[in-house]
Regions:
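Accessory DNA-binding and partner-docking regions appended to nucleic-acid-acting proteins
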Residues: 1-4, 340-341, 346-361, 367-372, ...
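Helicase motor core with emphasis on the C-terminal RecA-like subdomain
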Residues: 2-11, 15-19, 23-45, 52-55, ...
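Short alpha-helical "packing" element that flanks the helix-turn-helix/winged-helix DNA-binding module
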Residues: 21-24, 375, 483
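Short alpha-helical segment immediately N-terminal to, or the first helix within
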Residues: 27, 304, 378, 485-486
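Aromatic/hydrophobic pocket-lining residues that form π-stacking "cages" and hydrophobic walls in ligand
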Residues: 48, 317, 375, 459, ...
């Protein structure tokens, strides 16, 4: 009989769970509802994907964005999991085919938008089949206290109640204050849930803040981007105009950049997002419309060109860097103009004719102002930035982390901070071992030799060819950390390859011979 550990190894290629994952999996398998708050990159999806493959029926994953569904399902299919998504990106014929296959038992995991739960065709399907688990991803969207409130999330409970047999319910989010957690419990009506908040600490991330006048920001931004060379990155701007101007600035300097915001048509947004995911462009310049659920693991830097509206948004967006556990850099540029822009948007929401009572809108504006206050404090505080973030999310925080701009400034003159970034990244790599098992982190002795670097380059090239042939993002073949481990360990058999973190049985069967062949050729030619 399969166990959670055997599924983790066989399907996903990992020997052990990360902190917090195994207990969540066990509780869901035992039929207990779960409310899990885990930072971006902590492995939330494993927590519901593993039990989904062990429970008898189908798991429905409620997800807010088409891009998130496509990304998650693509990765699952590559790992050999029978998964599908149902949303408006499909034609009517494709939707009908997907539902027919679901009725025939093709799938174990189905991703849907919350609005889909109310549609008669899907409701009929849900009545006919055993739904073992309903997973609510990005669960903070259910709360008016949250930064991404979506009224459609409030109707998830009605769908669960309508099922012939109540499934176990798992709610997952990356950022949730006490108010948001209470809303999640109440609006989903979780039954005596197991609640867990794993550490928000991301030791591999270097945090920096820089005050810059609007006229100074273009030069500061270019300096930061040029230091990153060919690394993948995301630049967040507060307005569509700023996104377009910044994209043109980068492109004028020969930097491969693309834009993403709501005023672009759907086809352009989709093309630009794919170009970023498939490594055809280096940098995505975007409003906060981009990124929720994007699982590109090798983003090495995130720059906020403008201050976000709150720390929840900032930490979620910054957390899209370094999801592979490797060192990454998160920089916030801010000025007084940013605060005025955010207040303009708050006032605009107050004046909007959205059908909400005046007292409700006034309370929402008050909450937004409160969150903005803490965001402003973060931008200007002289204390440890990591400590400030962890304290805000209710976690014990160190007085200094030695891996943020403020901690470096405490010991060095301001003009030396950027020169110390490389050393900060090395410290981040070492401290990242605290976040996950050693098998998923680069140990000090794991430095690549010159020959290993050549092998790694050959593995990257092979991955790129295989991904292009299948029209997949490269990381869906194997992520960077897995290729690095191949270059270090140099497996020469399928058995040895399966010992590399991130290599499951299906991927070994699909890609193993080609990667083993490349390794053997490079090793024998030395």
């Amino acid at each position: 009989m399969e166990s959670p550990h055997s599924i983790l190894k066989k399907v996903f290629g990992y020997d052990s769970f990360r902190p917090g994952q195994e207990e969540i999996v066990s509780r869901l398998l035992a039929g207990q509802d779960v409310l899990a708050v885990m930072p971006t990159g902590a492995g939330k999806s494993i927590c519901y994907q593993v039990p989904a493959l062990l429970l008898p029926g189908i798991t429905i994953v409620v997800s807010p964005l088409v891009s998130l569904m496509k990304d998650q399902v693509g990765a699952l299919v590559q790992a050999g999991v029978a998964a599908a998504f149902l949303n408006n990106s499909l034609t009517d014929n494709q939707k009908a085919l997907m539902l027919r296959r679901a009725r025939e038992g093709w799938y174990k995991i189905i991703y849907v938008a919350p609005e889909r739960l109310e549609m008669p065709g899907f409701q009929r399907f849900a009545q006919e089949w055993e739904i073992s688990m309903v997973t609510v991803d990005e669960a903070h969207c259910i709360s008016q206290w949250g930064q991404d409130f979506r009224p459609s999330y409030l109707r998830i409970k009605a769908f669960v109640d309508s099922l012939p047999k109540r499934p176990v319910v798992g709610a997952f989010t990356a950022t949730a204050t006490a108010h948001v957690r209470e809303d999640i419990r109440t609006h989903l009506e979780l039954h005596t849930p197991y609640e867990v908040t794993t550490s928000f600490d991301r030791p591999n991330l270097y945090f920096a803040t820089r005050r810059a006048l609007p006229s100074e920001k273009p030069k500061v931004l270019l300096d930061l981007v040029l230091r990153e060379r060919d690394n993948a990155g995301i630049i967040y701007c507060s307005t569509t105009r700023q996104v377009d101007e910044t994209t043109r600035l980068l492109q004028s300097r020969g930097i491969r950049a693309a834009a993403y915001h709501a005023k672009l048509d759907a086809d352009t947004r989709r093309q630009n997002q794919d170009d970023f995911l498939y490594d055809r462009v280096q940098i995505m310049v975007a409003t906060n419309a981009f990124g929720m659920g994007i699982d590109k693991p090798n983003v090495r830097f995130v720059i906020h060109y403008n201050m976000p509206k709150d720390l929840e948004s900032y930490y979620q967006e910054a957390g899209r860097a370094g999801r592979d556990g490797e060192p990454a850099r998160c920089t916030l540029l801010y000025s007084g103009t940013d605060v005025r822009t955010i207040r303009f948007f708050i006032d605009k929401e107050m004046e909007a004719d959205n059908g909400l009572p005046a007292d409700v809108k006034a309370e929402a504006a008050r909450k937004a102002e409160e969150r903005l206050k803490y965001m402003t404090f973060y931008s200007t505080t002289p204390r440890c930035l990591r400590g400030y973030l962890l304290s805000y999310f209710g976690e014990a925080a160190p007085q200094k982390c030695e891996n943020c701009s403020n901690c470096l400034l405490a010991a060095q003159a301001a003009e030396q901070v950027e020169e110390q970034a490389a050393q900060a990244r090395q410290r981040a790599a070492a401290s990242a071992k605290r976040l996950a098992s050693a098998s998923r982190r680069r140990a000090d002795e794991d430095a690549l030799s010159e020959a290993d670097e050549k092998l790694l380059a050959a593995l990257y090239a092979l991955r790129k060819r295989l991904a292009a042939k299948q029209k997949l993002p490269a990381y869906m073949v194997f992520n960077d950390s897995t290729l690095r481990q191949m270059a270090l360990k140099k497996p020469l058999s399928v058995e040895e390859l399966l010992n590399i973190p991130g290599v499951g049985e299906k991927k070994a069967a699909r890609y193993g011979q080609e990667f083993l062949g490349t390794i053997e050729d490079m090793v024998s030619s030395r």
